[in-house]
Regions:
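Glycine-centered hinge/linker elements that transmit conformational signals in sensory
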Residues: 1-2, 35-65, 108
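Bilobed periplasmic-binding protein-like "clamshell/Venus-flytrap" ligand-binding domains
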Residues: 2-14, 150-162, 242-246
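Alpha-to-beta junction loops
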Residues: 4-7, 77-86, 101
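Pocket-flanking alpha-helical
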Residues: 1-7, 73, 90-96, 241
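Extracytoplasmic/periplasmic solute-binding protein
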Residues: 1-39, 45-46, 80
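Short, well-structured alpha-helical segments that form the helix of a local strand-helix-strand
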Residues: 1, 229-242
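C-terminal lobe and pocket-closing loops
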Residues: 89-100, 112-214
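Short helix-initiation/N-cap motifs at beta->coil->alpha
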Residues: 63-77
Length: 246
């Protein structure tokens, strides 16, 4: 694509680690093991994902940019043919009127040679919690259960009003979620996204989720700039292990 057009197939932001984390999540893998320890060195899935990601960057398949503003510019400026990200990025796409009808939603590519690999992952989103300090736990739990936990009418109301989409599967069957979206060529993007969400592998978000992303992302940038893979991954492992002791 880049050789023929000067454009990139995908774009990715160098400091956030979103793309690499989604690759890992699509395989049901993590940079922290079940015992809560740093798990980068010796993690076969992590090493495959990192090597693949580096190859995509070095071969001009993925444009690796330095910050979020540059990332958005590659999307709105038409420098990349596609992006891998969460549903929330659709708002950025839809701000570019001249690209109306040129985009559609599909599954992400699968990581080769990993038995647990899928075409599905998640990035971002929000969660609701009832804390131990709540004055009326039963009332709070009932509220969440009767709205976010079970009401398709509730989701039908907040989608057009606030653009809030749910991964609550029954919501995806409603008329509102199945409305064609003109920007995406008439594709019912919200019901499509909800259906995709049902296939995402289980993924435990540890307290060191963002620290692990930061360490691995630094390793990727170092590898792209010439640091041997083994050295970069060992540094990421050691740095993450140290952060876990702070």
């Amino acid at each position: 694509v880049h050789e023929k057009t000067g454009k990139y197939l995908l774009t990715s932001e160098a400091t956030g680690g979103d793309t690499l984390m989604m690759m890992m999540q699509s395989c049901g893998a993590n940079f922290v093991n079940e015992d809560g320890e740093a798990y980068i060195v010796g993690n076969e899935v992590a090493e495959k994902c990192i090597n693949l990601y580096v190859d995509l960057v070095k071969n001009d398949v993925v444009k690796l940019v330095n910050n979020w503003d540059e990332y958005i510019a590659t999307i709105t400026g038409g420098e990349a043919a596609g992006i891998v990200n969460g549903n929330w990025i659709t708002a950025t796409l839809m701000s570019t009127e001249d690209q109306k009808g040129l985009w559609q939603i599909t599954t992400m590519p699968k990581v080769d040679d990993v038995d647990t690999a899928t075409n599905y992952a998640n990035n971002g989103g929000s969660s609701w919690y009832v804390t131990s300090n709540c004055q009326n736990v039963e009332l709070a739990e009932d509220f969440l259960a009767s709205t976010f936990g079970s009401s398709t009418d509730f989701y039908d109301a907040i989608l057009p009003e606030a653009g809030a989409i749910s991964c609550y599967l029954p919501a995806g069957e409603s008329k509102v979620y199945n409305e064609p979206n003109e920007f995406f060529g008439g594709q019912p993007i919200f019901s499509t996204i909800v259906e995709y969400s049902s296939h995402i592998p289980e993924f435990t978000k540890t307290p060191y989720h963002y620290e692990s992303r930061e360490c691995v992302n630094t390793a990727v940038v170092n590898i792209v700039n010439g640091t041997p893979v083994e050295d970069a991954l060992q540094e990421a492992q050691d740095t993450l292990a140290f952060k876990m002791t702070e």
